[in-house]
Regions:
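Helix-start/capping segments and mature chain N-termini
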Residues: 1-155
Length: 155
């Protein structure tokens, strides 16, 4: 049974929990989920972004990806940095030949992905675009970017 992941709800995490259990049983840190047609959807609890030839790609929402807050934050960051983001259907093969790959999410924040299915992604380390996105993200969430101060609530 497939669950649509357009909202964070307990039932929607069932596939994610099962996928993550299977991934960790096989020695991986995280799972990458595909939609019912075999296109990349998201991680078990994160959105996924692919960098190829300087362009950032992410699955469009029709693939079942969650329209997450951190995902949308990355869209703002990319615009600020003059980087192009394209939402499209992404094949598993496109993941393997990516220059860079990263997850985003509330817990993941911006996390580089070094390999998938034991296939090294790009250089096997955090790439320059992922680094720019990650640094800008941490500047925002740590209050070092005044443009986004209105996003923060002091507690």
């Amino acid at each position: 049974m497939l669950f649509r992941s357009q909202a964070k709800a307990v039932s929607n995490y069932t596939n994610s929990i099962l996928a993550n259990m299977e991934a960790t049983d096989e020695g991986y840190d995280e799972a990458l989920l595909l939609d019912s047609q075999g296109f990349v959807s998201e991680g078990a609890g994160e959105n996924v972004f692919v960098v190829k030839d300087g362009v950032i790609y992410t699955p469009d929402l029709s693939a079942g990806a969650l329209n997450g807050i951190t995902r949308n934050t990355v869209f703002h960051i990319a615009k600020d940095l003059g980087l192009e983001i394209v939402q499209k259907r992404i094949t598993r093969d496109e993941i393997y030949i990516a220059d860079e790959l990263f997850f985003t999410g509330t817990a993941a924040e911006v996390t580089p992905i070094r390999e998938l299915d034991r296939v090294e992604i790009g250089s096997g380390s955090r790439g320059p675009i992922t680094e720019k996105i990650q640094n800008a993200f941490f500047d925002i969430v740590n209050g070092r970017n005044p443009k986004y101060a209105h996003w923060l609530t002091a507690v």
